[in-house]
Amino acid sequence: MKKIDVALFGVWFLVVLSFLTTFPTDDFMVFWAYAKQVSYSSYDGLAAIVNVWELKGLLFRMIYYTDALITSLFINDYSLLYAFVYKLIGLAGYFSLLLVTVRVVPKQYSEGIGRARLFFALGILLLTVHFASHLQAEMWGVLFVILALALYLNDKIWCQIIAAIVYSSTFYLKSPMPLLGGTLFFGAMLIKRQTLGRAIKEIIPFAITTVLFLSLSLFLVYRYYPQEITDICDASYYQHTLLQDGWYWGAVKKLIRGFISNSFLYNIPCALGVIAALYLFVKWCKGNDYKQCVLLVLTWVFPLVYIILSNCYFVYHYYLLVYPTVITLLLFHRECSMTIPGNRPLYVVLGTYMAYYTFGLSSIAPTNLDIKHEYTKTWEENKQKKGISLGCRMGGGEMLFLDSGLGAFIFNNKSYLRYFYVLPLQRISPDNPFTKTDTYKKVKQKTMAYRGEYLTLEADWFFKNGNKDIKEKIEKEYKLYAIIDIPEQPWDLFHIDKEVGHLSLYKRVKH
């Protein structure tokens, strides 16, 4: 085994170890709460997954529900071990899909790399990211479109068809995800050295299959699970996208600031991708190959369009830039092979990357290793809190959860509403057009009709946009029963050493 293979495996092993032992974020709280609510559902199979609402796409809900279901076969309490097993199972599925991807990449486009090196290199690039991106929809989405690209690079028609199906499936991870199709198209043009006419001719079967698959799948979902289509349409109201809020120039400023911080500091592979892209851009400009330069820029544009349209600029949105990074590095390997005598830029880039990664590894990912004992201690202390102890004795009755998901995570009760965190009420101001929809009216009416024994309330969160009538109902019919502290860091659910908010448990006043 060559030294570079040993080094590559060593870095990959460190990345995987860091991934598995890094703290879960508060999004996992929602994922696990969702899995519990599905298990309480009176429906079976896919109907149960659809019946319980969550903002993410249907395919992504199926992925993390399956992950949680398998994890519960081994351990069923939300401990450090549960988080580790959950991420281990998720990563096993992720790497299985990555193995398929590596196998279908045509040999002529990975010449000089080899499948084993390609697997480890891609594993490093996909996992060397901020822990807020771990197992998010964007992380799965990037792997899906990399697999679609690998299939698309094959000339066989059946590969084109499967590539289109895989690519189309990203719609059910997050509905804007198919925007990455632009990166796939222009990236394939660069890799295959195609003319525009040839590329358009070749993508026709892919495009037709994409339209047919999405149309057919949406029809079937509408036919058998119409509520899912309603949820997809309603989701646009809950998110402050650029389409909802309207264009403003400050969005560009936020995009650039996020690109610098969330890409270079937290999603480390993007730094390597940008360095390689700048080198290729300068090289092609010197050779008057401006077509290549334009295609390279377009390859990076579509993930940025996704980010700016989302109008949130979360760190996991910038994870999408790993996709053009992979394409750029593949091009860089072809243009700057180490086998060419005197060609050393790859050494420079790899050295820069390794130095930067060493810094990132010591300052970002493994901080959990340094405070593991504090982490365990904090979790055990948190489990003893009065509110959680109460939750274990609440019984199996339905509860109204008026919080951001913490209540459904802590208490072992079925949600009174199918929305175990009620975005249809919390995200909607009184003047919002959504208040005229059937969804809003039904959720509001059912909430006002609640007569259960207990309810949870995260007041600062729930009353942010109004809901005065619900506030009056609570003040009149319920009394404060217990308070559960909310952690300071929104990206770190379990590391609770400071409190800045409260989840309130209310009990019905008996008249």
Language-model segments: residues:
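Membrane-interface alpha helices of multi-pass inner-membrane proteins
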Residues: 160-175, 181-186, 300-309
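Extracytoplasmic
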Residues: 56, 176-177, 222, 226-227, ...
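Short hydrophobic/aromatic helix or loop-helix immediately within or flanking a transmembrane segment
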Residues: 33-37, 51-84, 170
